[in-house]
């Protein structure tokens, strides 16, 4: 059983999927599985998923004949996940190469039940914009309820998993 399941919903992602997959292949932490859910893509995304899976036994691909949306794709991934922990990655995003290792080690050292991190936007002009709704730190249940519920949920009842 892998330590971490990474679920990637894929739809019409041919132009940028290679960067996402490369970021997984180059992770310094190796005890992961990658679940690619091709959600009815009509571009070359499905073939890229299959090619990547053929090279790495940790990768599983699920193809849907028609698009059902990102939530259903993630739910399919959740149903298939075998990891002790689960994370999501969008097909047009990528991880830093040490991301999973860093999160895993911090979680192991602290005994935490979950780990989270910020993100960096790569802007069209090549600049980067770091974003984080969560201050760095290790939190107990009470602190999570007090400090993190607002940033995680925001002022809305529904907040994107990642945006």
Residue ranges with predicted function:
Residues 1-163:
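Nucleotide-sugar donor-binding/catalytic module of glycosyltransferases
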């Amino acid at each position: 059983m892998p330590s971490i399941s990474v679920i990637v919903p894929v739809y019409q992602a041919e132009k940028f999927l290679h960067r996402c997959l490369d970021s997984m292949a180059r992770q310094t932490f190796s005890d992961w599985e990658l679940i690619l859910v091709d959600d009815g893509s009509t571009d070359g995304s499905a073939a890229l998923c299959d090619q990547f899976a053929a090279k790495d036994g940790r990768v599983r691909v699920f193809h849907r004949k028609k698009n059902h949306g990102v939530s259903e794709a993630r739910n399919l991934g959740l149903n298939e996940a075998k990891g002790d922990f689960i994370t999501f990655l969008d097909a047009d995003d990528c991880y830093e190469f040490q991301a999973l290792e860093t999160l895993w080690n911090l979680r192991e050292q602290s005994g935490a039940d979950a780990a989270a991190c910020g993100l960096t936007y790569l802007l069209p002009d090549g600049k980067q914009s770091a974003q984080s709704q969560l201050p760095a730190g290790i939190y107990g249940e009470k602190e999570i309820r007090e400090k993190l519920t607002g940033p995680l949920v925001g002022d809305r009842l529904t907040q994107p998993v990642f945006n």
